[in-house]
């Protein structure tokens, strides 16, 4: 188990986060919620946790999967959300789930230093392919 309080030195951790914990109730609940929202048979390819700080310089990128899901664990400033292709910013509200085509160019919105140093954003990212 990773405590958000103790997790001070990492900005990304475990690309196999969910498979390592798939039998735990909280992970089953999250996986089932994603499956329900998508309403198709899906296969998890990768999962990890991001910790976003002011010194992070997130760049635009995409994934090679059918779907990318971002679950926001903690984010005091939701306006610093996920930036999608063409500079569309989707707010990152705590306990929210963003699902989009993994091939869409996207990035985490970088926070100003004055905010990010004391208010990290924690998110769980999951990549899926359709079965």
Model-derived regions: residue spans:
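Non-heme Fe(II)/2-oxoglutarate
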Residues: 1-41, 57
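Catalytic core of non-heme Fe(II) oxygenases with the double-stranded beta-helix
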Residues: 40-131
């Amino acid at each position: 188990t990773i405590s958000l309080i103790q997790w001070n030195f990492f900005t990304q951790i475990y690309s196999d986060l969910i498979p390592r914990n798939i039998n735990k109730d909280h992970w089953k609940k999250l996986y089932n919620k994603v499956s329900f929202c998508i309403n198709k048979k899906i296969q998890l390819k990768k999962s990890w946790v991001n910790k976003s700080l002011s010194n992070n310089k997130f760049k635009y990128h995409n994934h090679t999967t059918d779907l990318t899901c971002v679950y926001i664990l903690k984010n005091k400033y939701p306006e610093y959300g996920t930036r999608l292709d063409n500079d569309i910013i989707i707010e990152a509200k705590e306990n929210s789930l963003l699902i989009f085509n993994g091939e869409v160019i996207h990035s985490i919105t970088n926070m100003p230093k004055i905010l990010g140093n004391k208010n990290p954003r924690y998110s769980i990212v999951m990549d899926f392919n359709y079965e």
